[in-house]
């Protein structure tokens, strides 16, 4: 009968500790790019929906990751990552 291999690798950081560190990092980044009252409202919504649970922590992590991804993808003025918007010529000469 097959058996799962023994875990011989280095001890991984506990999930809860890693998750809280990730949340803190995302919050620090989000504050640099979004208004504090807006982020506070998001936090209140998550708290009212999930309470003080790990499900709420995971939900706000997912939301902040998506918001920051889209924000950078659209073209954050603080970042070199993103879509470069080019002005189009009115006469259509730049079309190929």
Swiss-Prot record:
It is found in: Virion; Host nucleus; Host extracellular space. The modification Phosphoserine is found at residues 79, 94, 96. GO terms for biological process: DNA-templated transcription; monoatomic ion transmembrane transport; protein homooligomerization; regulation of DNA-templated transcription; symbiont entry into host cell; symbiont-mediated activation of host apoptosis; symbiont-mediated arrest of host cell cycle during G2/M transition; viral penetration into host nucleus. Residues 1-42 are annotated as: Homooligomerization. Keywords: Activator, AIDS, Apoptosis, Cell cycle, Host G2/M cell cycle arrest by virus, Host nucleus, Host-virus interaction, Ion channel, Ion transport, Modulation of host cell cycle by virus, Phosphoprotein, Transcription, Transcription regulation, Transport, Viral penetration into host nucleus, Virion, Virus entry into host cell. Coiled coil: none annotated. One of its GO terms (cellular component) is host cell. HIV-1 lineages are divided in three main groups, M (for Major), O (for Outlier), and N (for New, or Non-M, Non-O). The vast majority of strains found worldwide belong to the group M. Group O seems to be endemic to and largely confined to Cameroon and neighboring countries in West Central Africa, where these viruses represent a small minority of HIV-1 strains. The group N is represented by a limited number of isolates from Cameroonian persons. The group M is further subdivided in 9 clades or subtypes (A to D, F to H, J and K). Homooligomer, may form homodimer. Interacts with p6-gag region of the Pr55 Gag precursor protein through a (Leu-X-X)4 motif near the C-terminus of the P6gag protein. Interacts with host UNG. May interact with host RAD23A/HHR23A. Interacts with host VPRBP/DCAF1, leading to hijack the CUL4A-RBX1-DDB1-DCAF1/VPRBP complex, mediating ubiquitination of host proteins such as TERT and ZGPAT and arrest of the cell cycle in G2 phase. During virus replication, may deplete host UNG protein, and incude G2-M cell cycle arrest. Acts by targeting specific host proteins for degradation by the 26S proteasome, through association with the cellular CUL4A-DDB1 E3 ligase complex by direct interaction with host VPRPB/DCAF-1. Cell cycle arrest reportedly occurs within hours of infection and is not blocked by antiviral agents, suggesting that it is initiated by the VPR carried into the virion. Additionally, VPR induces apoptosis in a cell cycle dependent manner suggesting that these two effects are mechanistically linked. During virus entry, plays a role in the transport of the viral pre-integration (PIC) complex to the host nucleus. This function is crucial for viral infection of non-dividing macrophages. May act directly at the nuclear pore complex, by binding nucleoporins phenylalanine-glycine (FG)-repeat regions. This is Protein Vpr. It comes from Human immunodeficiency virus type 1 group M subtype C (isolate 92BR025) (HIV-1).
